[in-house]
Amino acid sequence: MKKYVTTKSVQPVAFRLTTLSLVMSAVLGSASVIAGEKLDMSFIQGGGGVNPEVWAALNGSYAPGRYLVDLSLNGKEAGKQILDVTPQDSNELCLTEAWLTKAGVYVSADYFREGYDATRQCYVLTKAPSVKVDFDVSTQSLALSIPQKGLVKMPENVDWDYGTSAFRVNYNANANTGRNNTSAFGSADLKANIGHWVVSSSATASGGDSGDNSTTINMFTATRAIRALSADLAVGKTSTGDSLLGSTGTYGVSLSRNNSMKPGNLGYTPVFSGIANGPSRVTLTQNGRLLHSEMVPAGPFSITDVPLYTSGDVTMKITGEDGRDEVQNFPLSVMAGQLSPGQHEFSVAAGLPDDDSDLKGGVFAASYGYGLDGLTLRAGGVFNQDWQGASAGVVAGLGYLGAVSADGAYATAKYRDGSHSGNKVQLSWSKQLETTNTGLRVSWSRQSEEYEGMSSFDPTELWSQSNHGRRTKDEWNAGISQPVGGLFSLSVSGWQRSYYPASMTGSYRYSDDNGKETGITGSLSTQIKGVSLNLGWSGSRNSRGENNWSASASVSVPFTLFDRRYSSSASVSTSKGGGTGFSTGVSGSLNDRFSYGLGGGRDGDGGTSSYLNASYSGDRAYLNGVLNHSQSGGTSGSVSVSGSVLAVPAAKDIMFSRTTGDTVAVVNVKDTPGVKVTSGDGQTDSDGNLVVPLNSYDWNTVTIDTGTLPLSTELTNTSQKVVPTDKAVVWMPFDALKVKRYLLQVKQRDGEFVPGGTWARDSKNTPLGFVANNGVLMINTVDAPGDITLGQCRIPAARLQDTEKLQEITCE
């Protein structure tokens, strides 16, 4: 084995070397020698005073001691690690597998079989071929050179991190007031992490001048991931059913395969978009249940972060300042994903209907899917004493022709006046044209008149009741998206829905009702040198032949003024019966936390309007406020706040954060505020804690920004890797070491500088570094060095000052 010792002066992170010391370091750094060879030090000023025995000891063995080393693997930095060198390591450094794994070095057991010390349970890496271990005492660095065959990839079957015990509340609240109305909305997601379980619940509340106040508190749901099955077990408030037959809320238990436990699986997120003629409140409901409510400014908007738990149309209501409502329905069509060959999915659920369901008795559902080469098969069923249904589906890849799915369902519903059975068929096709990058999609569904999905079934009704309403017959959805040469992107989609004739018993039907509704939406967007242009339009026709349409255009231009970045924008919108309105404004930011905007224009009624908004992205919450004024609505305002409150017993702290992700890490650098990470926003609080978002079931690397650490603090490891389960709160402490740094200029009792090359040792005889020219000695040490010995003289510990400033000191 060859060991190298490079004679460099110690360079602490917090110090800058003088030109003289840099030159000295360079000269000494070129004087690397192989152990066993003699080095003539007489050519270096003061080198003749170096003790040959000390020099030989440093070159011939690893000096026992505790070192904070800079680790590198094959020339790549791997962070800092604490290295304990024992007397047994004096000739051969032996590293445990735990130490290597913590450092991110994964070695092949077969390659290093000859170097494994079974007694000490560690690896002598240099016993394997082509391996070099370079431990430089003077710079406290450890360089490992290991061939590719000696390394293995990061283990795939690593243990999941279920996190630590925690309780959190993710909250969102907004309120507005104006001449005609005052309203407020608030929601809270509650989660408690207990062992491998996550207990969740939610609450919403809304109220206003209209007296339509509501409060909803959902029963808890306890979930946990089961790795052996790659499945989620849920107990409590669950949903039982499937996407085609429908579903209902239940109090029970479910076990579902979760393919997102493997990286790369993405889900579908619906988008709800529209146009607001002025500052408005947008409310989303499904099956009579409030999903979401928020204030939006004038112009086009989109809402993309509302989760859906049951199938069915989503109703979007836009309420303006003048109290007028605009209602829009979003027909949803879901296409099941294709499974990889050999991959399977399953779901089993059972429970009693919740308070929002009309069903009586227990509900049981089961489904299974399996992936073949280019083909996915699915089947399922839902059973209740009054409703039973079965479904089957197939998804096939057609190569150049795209992909197609076909699903069918058959259900029997038992009403008060007898049972009725029906069927439903659904077809979907999608294709991405490689040559033009055109995206195409078409879907069609049809159901018989007597088919009733579980979501809308009420066993207390009569089939012949007049309030049964019109029943959907078939529905078409088609869409195309087309980017053009990187200049602009075009998207167009349309839908048509047909109904069976409504019952004439006890109800009124318009004579011109043709039983068919249609709609179309489109958008065109482009961005050229930072300038963005967006065009949008939509139109619909109801079953009586009445048309409705709207269109909008907006442009955004960035500019710089007084070394600050701003963005100016202008938009115009028009709709049938809503007039034409336009607005213009400018936005900017004072820093990375505070942003603002102001502008004005004309609303759809011809009156002028103006607005002022501001937002603050703090470490503990996100705040937003808007002030509006218009001739028709007067002065109005709205405010909103969102954030998270997280209590972690392991941290002995309650943290307020704007991070509201489901899966998070609590980074801790004990009692060290102001520390940042490279993968998130914010900085540690007074207790050294910071909440950082993570991706569940995937490798996450959290790295400390070492530039934000205090000068007296070093970390044993600057990054950690973790694979968290969904909704886990991972406690991630970083061991902080208070490093003692000394910059000394040492003189002997006769006033002469201590000769260069003289080694300094602590009270335990551990090497600390050597003296450079003009008696300069730089020391970094984790433990208090005690008295320092420099050859024949000594520096008492009481005379040492832990400071970055140069200390002149005379040794005894």
From Swiss-Prot:
GO function terms (MF aspect): fimbrial usher porin activity
Designated name of the protein: Outer membrane usher protein FaeD
Organism: Escherichia coli
GO biological process, one term: pilus assembly
Membrane topology designation: Multi-pass membrane protein
InterPro entries reported in the protein's UniProt record: Fimb_usher, Fimbrial_membr_usher_CS, FimD_plug_dom, PapC_N, PapC_N_sf
Compartments, as annotated in UniProt: Cell outer membrane
A GO cellular component annotation in the UniProt record: cell outer membrane
